Design a protein with these regions (language model features):
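Short acidic active-site motifs
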Residues: 13, 76-77, 99
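Active-site rim beta-loop-alpha module in soluble metabolic enzymes
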Residues: 31-92
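Conserved beta-strand elements of the Class I
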Residues: 26-28
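Short alpha-helical
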Residues: 33, 97-98, 117
Length: 130
């Protein structure tokens, strides 16, 4: 289907937001198998030269509710991406949202939750009359 209304993808909005926070960004994926899909989007967007890396935490969406395991792995991934040169990190799954602030505090770099980024961009478009 086609529409004349704007369509904002959460991954794209998350990456665009991350690019305003520094030169290079990283992505935290849920599974290794998610990375190829993310890379296709990053390449299509033309921003692969600014990707510091992507790390998978090895948990399917259903297991993200295990707070201890998820938070530990996400913090480890964010710190590794920071050490790889990322100035900010994008969460690769909307199911990670509840961990954003704690991961950001532990890693010491901005962490972008892509659904929040998309909502803010959509609100901006509305306010600008687009």
């Amino acid at each position: 289907e086609t529409t004349r209304k704007p369509v904002l993808g959460i991954m794209e909005c998350g990456i665009f937001t991350a690019l305003t926070l520094g030169q290079r960004f990283g992505v935290i994926a849920i599974l290794q198998s998610s990375i190829a899909r993310h890379l296709r989007t990053i390449i299509t967007m033309g921003v692969q030269s600014r990707l510091a890396g992507e790390r998978a935490i090895g948990l399917p969406v259903i297991e993200l509710s295990d707070e201890s395991k998820t938070l530990t792995r996400m913090i480890g991934a964010a710190k590794a991406l920071r050490d790889d040169g990322a100035d900010s990190v994008v969460m690769g799954c909307a199911g990670m949202a509840q961990y954003r602030k704690r991961v950001e505090q532990a890693a010491g770099i901005p962490v972008v939750e892509p659904t929040q980024a998309a909502v803010v961009m959509a609100l901006g478009r509305v306010r600008l009359g687009w």
